[in-house]
Amino acid sequence: MNSLVATPPIPPHFYEHNRFNTTSRFVSPMNPAGSRKRKAEDDNGSSDHDTRMSASPTSSPALPTKPLAARQIKRPRPNLSGRPLSLGRLFETLDSDALRSVLRSLCDRHPELGQEVVDTAPRPNITSALQVLSNYQSTLQSSFPLGGNPSSDYAYNRVRPHVMNLLDALNDFTPHFLPPNETHPSTSLNYLDGVTEIIHQLPRWDTPHYNLEKEAAYEEIAKAWALVIREASKRGGGIQLQYGEWDQKLAKHNQTSGGKLQDAVHELSASLGWMAGNPSHPGPGCPQADTASIRQQLLSGTYGAGLPLKVGPW
């Protein structure tokens, strides 16, 4: 009876105290000195690191700063809807044929725009004009029927519209390169040289009266040659005609055409009467021939080459 002693009850706050102290009993004790040493090293390292980071460099060069361009960001339209193209974008979609059609239609409906277009458009040059004529020539050559006689009446009827288109273009382009509209004789001569080659390529037909169109083209181009030669002979004593070998070029064209350019050849001979081998040039005793001979020697730098050099008092 004496061994069974009633155990007094344990107050609740005692359990709370033991619960908080239970973890500390299982944690291994740490070295106080080591803990203090590591803490001092960490503090010193952190202090040195802060000092290095806060210090500004003394020897590093200053890098130039470039101002950044403000980016222009296109924001999407809040209300997107269909709309037609602007005039500039519309022109970008048109090829040369469509653009010519639009301009021709505008000029027909508004005649006052025609002169403004002429004043605004760049002046046609030899290359562009001959290219247009060459395109007509290529269309003509490709329109011949396959097989058969290319100079027959059947072939003529097939290609006649293209022949007329080429001849109409020749009649329109040639006056543009003639004086007084064209003030440079070299430009006129080079154009006539190229366009005469195109006339040489016109077909010859078995029926004689079908060839009248080509002969008329030769007649007109011969008149153009004569006009340009007369104007060129007035500039610089005809030096462009003499040193441009135009006598040889024109003689070759005349031979290819079968003598259709003989009038132009005579005009060139009259303008350059001192040329060797010219049957129409004046005789040696004529004052005009003597003047031309002196001019020729001055231009070639041989004047006075055969005269003795006089030394001493005059």
From Swiss-Prot:
The lineage of its organism: Eukaryota, Fungi, Dikarya, Ascomycota, Pezizomycotina. Residues 39-52 have a biased composition (Basic and acidic residues). The keyword Chaperone does not apply. Binds the proteasome. Residues 54-68 have a biased composition (Low complexity). Residues 24-85 are annotated as: Disordered. Signal peptide: none annotated. GO terms for molecular function: proteasome binding. GO terms for biological process: nuclear protein quality control by the ubiquitin-proteasome system; proteasome localization; protein transport. Keywords: Cytoplasm, Nucleus, Protein transport, Transport. This is Tethering factor for nuclear proteasome STS1.
